A protein has these predicted regions:
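Short helix-initiation/N-cap motifs at beta->coil->alpha
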Residues: 52, 75-85
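Structural transition elements
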Residues: 1-30, 51-56
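Detector for C-terminal structural segments
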Residues: 1-7, 53-62, 85-193
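Short, well-ordered beta-strand elements
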Residues: 41-50, 73-76, 93
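Short alpha-helix C-terminal cap/hinge motif
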Residues: 60-75
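Short helix/loop segment immediately N-terminal to the Walker
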Residues: 30-43
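Short secondary-structure junction motifs
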Residues: 39-41, 70, 161-163
Length: 193
């Protein structure tokens, strides 16, 4: 492996900077499509674990939604048992949770949760084109084909699923010196809404 995946497959799935005007444009287009007005937007509930960190993150999201889009929200912090139960049963408007991407890539972990075969109220996503891209990536016979097919799955995911990456953390890997031809980055965990 030479270099990073991002160097080989350049793509910005989600812009790193906010575009309030574009967000307002999308909101207005959605309202027009539904035949609704901004006054008819309900108050949304933001479900999270009852930790101060989760509450603080959702307070920032709450402020951004109100300030930029005029959308009212309430924060519903719950014990881990209640939060997981509500998330798994689909009893939420927006859920703040986390997921590990795994190594060597996200195909066997995170992205598999969006295939039609993995239907649950937690994700509630089904798309035949996504399934086809995912299956091709999983069945790729070489690392080069797997990377190229993974990239197509990742692009489709970024462009078509309702998922908002709010931040990420990483961890380190250690390996014995003297190995050659070995490349590894840190494992990435991210939190999404």
């Amino acid at each position: 492996v030479n270099g990073t995946f991002d160097e080989e497959f350049e793509y910005e799935g989600w812009p790193a900077s906010a575009d309030v005007e574009k967000a307002q444009e999308y909101l207005n287009a959605a309202l027009d499509e539904l035949g609704k007005t901004a006054d008819e937007i309900p108050t949304f509930e933001l479900l999270c674990y009852e930790s101060q960190g989760s509450i603080d993150v959702l307070a920032a999201v709450q402020d951004m939604l109100k300030k930029n889009l005029g959308i009212e929200t309430t924060i519903n912090s719950q014990t881990i048992q209640v939060m997981v139960s509500n998330a798994m049963s689909g009893d939420y408007d927006f859920w703040y949770g986390g997921n590990s991407l795994e190594i060597p890539d996200a195909l066997t972990g995170f992205l598999s949760g969006y295939t039609s075969a993995m239907q649950s109220a937690l994700r509630g996503y089904s798309n035949e084109e996504y399934d086809k891209l995912y299956d091709e990536a999983i069945a790729s016979p070489t690392i080069e084909e797997r990377k190229a097919n993974y990239f197509e799955v990742e692009k489709f995911f970024c462009d078509n699923t309702l998922n908002l990456i709010l931040g990420w953390t990483d961890g380190g890997f250690q390996y014995k010196s003297g190995y050659t031809g070995f490349y590894n980055t840190t494992e990435t965990d991210f939190t999404y809404l």
